[in-house]
Swiss-Prot record:
Its EC number is 2.3.2.-. The active site is at C263 (glycyl thioester intermediate). Homdimer. Interacts with ATG7; this interaction forms an E1-E2 complex that is essential for the transfer of GABARAP thioester from ATG7 to ATG3 and disrupts interaction with the E3 enzyme complex. Interacts with ATG12; this interaction is ATG7-dependent, essential for phosphatidylethanolamine (PE)-conjugated ATG8-like proteins formation and also mediates the autoconjugation of ATG12 on ATG3. Interacts with the E3 enzyme complex composed of 4 sets of ATG12-ATG5 and ATG16L1 (400 kDa); this interaction disrupts interaction with ATG7 and promotes ATG8-like proteins lipidation. InterPro entries: Atg3/Atg10 (IPR007135). One of its GO terms (cellular component) is cytosol. The gene is atg3. Keywords: Autophagy, Cytoplasm, Isopeptide bond, Protein transport, Transferase, Transport, Ubl conjugation, Ubl conjugation pathway. It comes from the Eukaryota. E2 conjugating enzyme that catalyzes the covalent conjugation of the C-terminal Gly of ATG8-like proteins (GABARAP, GABARAPL1, GABARAPL2 or MAP1LC3A) to the amino group of phosphatidylethanolamine (PE)-containing lipids in the membrane resulting in membrane-bound ATG8-like proteins which is one of the key steps in the development of autophagic isolation membranes during autophagosome formation. Cycles back and forth between binding to ATG7 for loading with the ATG8-like proteins and binding to E3 enzyme, composed of ATG12, ATG5 and ATG16L1 to promote ATG8-like proteins lipidation. This is Ubiquitin-like-conjugating enzyme ATG3. Conjugated to ATG12 at Lys-242. ATG12-conjugation plays a role in regulation of mitochondrial homeostasis and cell death, while it is not involved in phosphatidylethanolamine-conjugation to ATG8-like proteins and autophagy. A motif (Membrane-curvature-sensing motif) lies at residues 4-19. One of its GO terms (molecular function) is Atg8-family ligase activity. The membrane-curvature-sensing motif targets curved membranes. The N-terminal region works in concert with its geometry-selective amphipathic helix (AH) to promote LC3-PE conjugation activity only on the target membrane.
């Protein structure tokens, strides 16, 4: 039933997006939405600091006229996913309800990281260090689920003030991925089953919601496409079929992909902007995608995509 509802809703939103005029005046600070021009600026900033991300044109027949032909969307490929979400340690104390009034019980950050510095000291200045984001494609940021999973549940403000924007120096050399993907025939039993998967991730501009939108498609260790049920194993179960739905990519041919629905993105970003402003700082729109990739990690906590970890509020 949920799949049928999502399909009908998706078709309705396609029509609504087609009829929605292109946003031309910036409303980033007021509402958290962005114009296509601001999406381009944020995308250029992401590509500059995280070279594993690149602009792409997609299919010529699906080009959106409000974006340059060669900058229709962003993509990063062969992103490692070493384990399934159910393999992560989890308890109710780690949940944080991000939004409660969306009709689906809120956006739950199942693997919320706590124990970080508060907003009083942190929301004073935005700094960006670029040396650890990967000047080559050999460096991919690692999900820091090993050390930060302990602590009490936090509310929306705690999530925005610290959990989204914490410092993290961890990186991994992707040259190890090839070695990890070799069959381990000598182990025997369940240990011989290779867990590593890879994902292609895409960020598009959603004209209806006027925010970025994340798409992902997964492959097994032999680079064979994963079934939808298999991809759901790498998504927080609180978000499957709710925050995450299966839809056609707006710029690429089938098969359909998993997509993180953008209906809450602007609201979350607006609250982050307000938090920064309350601390005397100012969040530039060019930082949008870096922060966006940070907060959607709650949905796909085991997919280790690249984004700048070295920015503090």
């Amino acid at each position: 039933m949920q799949n049928v509802f999502n399909t009908v809703k998706g078709k309705a939103l396609e029509v609504a997006e087609y009829l929605t005029p292109v946003l031309k005046e910036s409303k980033f600070k007021e509402t958290g939405v962005i114009t296509p021009e601001e999406f381009l600026a944020a995308g250029d900033h992401l590509v500059h600091h995280c070279p594993t991300w690149q602009w792409s044109a997609g299919e010529e027949s699906k080009i959106k006229p409000y974006l340059p032909n060669d900058k229709q969307f962003l993509m990063t490929k062969n992103v490692p996913c070493y384990k399934r979400c159910k393999q992560m340690e989890y308890s109710d104390e780690q949940e944080a309800i991000i939004e409660e009034d969306d009709g689906d019980g809120g956006w739950v950050d199942t693997f919320h990281h706590t124990g970080l510095s508060g907003v009083t000291e942190a929301v004073k200045e935005i700094t960006l260090e670029t040396q650890d984001c990967g000047k080559t494609t050999d460096n991919i940021a690692v999900c820091d689920d090993d050390d930060d999973d302990e602590g009490e549940a936090a509310d929306m403000e705690d999530y925005e003030e610290s959990g989204l924007l914490e410092n993290d120096d961890a990186t991994v050399d992707t040259s190890k991925i090839k070695e990890a993907c070799k069959p381990k025939a000598d182990l025997g039993g369940e240990d011989a089953i290779l867990q590593t998967r890879t994902y292609d991730l895409y960020i598009t501009y959603d004209k209806y919601y006027q925010t970025p939108r994340l798409w992902l498609f997964g492959y097994d260790e032999q680079r064979r496409p994963l079934a939808v049920e298999n991809m759901y194993e790498d998504i927080s179960q609180d978000h499957v079929k709710k925050t995450v739905t299966i839809e056609n990519h707006p710029h690429l041919p089938p098969p359909p992909m998993c997509s993180v629905h953008p209906c809450r993105h602007a609201e979350v970003m607006k609250k982050i902007i307000e938090t920064v402003a309350e601390g005397g700082g100012e969040l530039g729109v060019h930082m949008y995608l870096l922060i966006f990739l940070k907060f959607v990690q709650a949905v796909i906590p085991t997919i280790e995509y690249d984004y700048t970890r070295h920015f503090t509020m």
